[in-house]
Curated annotation (Swiss-Prot):
Protein name: Non-specific lipid-transfer protein 2
Described purpose of this protein according to its UniProt entry: Plant non-specific lipid-transfer proteins transfer phospholipids as well as galactolipids across membranes. May play a role in wax or cutin deposition in the cell walls of expanding epidermal cells and certain secretory tissues.
Stretch forming the signal peptide: 1-25
Gene: LTP2
Claim: Signal is one of the keywords in the record: yes
Regions annotated as coiled coil: none
């Protein structure tokens, strides 16, 4: 389990350093993952859901205000989930918006077609 946490932290650190967002650029995966960093323990170790995690989910929803940004956020979430691998609790990931009382227009799942997100 420690190996999964190290991998998850390394992936998040790399994505956070990925670079700033420019005015017309899509939301970066660093931004997406940075907002959800507080959710790692909840999603991988079954820790209790924290307000910090839910604040990140809310921030992410508010930042993804355009269709291209929502599609990019979807792709970033899928990439991060693949990087974490089998240590990710997919049911908790799918239920994260609901648990945080945040409505997002797509399901957090590896099977989500991000191109159809509006």
């Amino acid at each position: 389990m420690a190996g999964v946490m190290k991998l998850a932290c390394m992936v998040l650190a790399c994505m956070i350093v990925a670079g700033p967002i420019t005015a017309n650029a899509l939301m970066s995966c660093g931004t997406v993952n940075g907002n959800l960093a507080g959710c790692i323990a909840y999603l991988t170790r079954g820790a209790p859901l924290t307000q910090g995690c839910c604040n990140g989910v809310t921030n992410l929803k508010n930042m993804a205000s355009t269709t291209p940004d929502r599609q990019q956020a979807c792709r970033c979430l899928q990439s991060a989930a693949k990087a974490v691998g089998p240590g990710l609790n997919t049911a908790r990931a799918a239920g994260l918006p609901s648990a945080c009382k945040v409505n997002i227009p797509y399901k957090i799942s590896a099977s989500t077609n991000c191109n159809t997100v509006r």
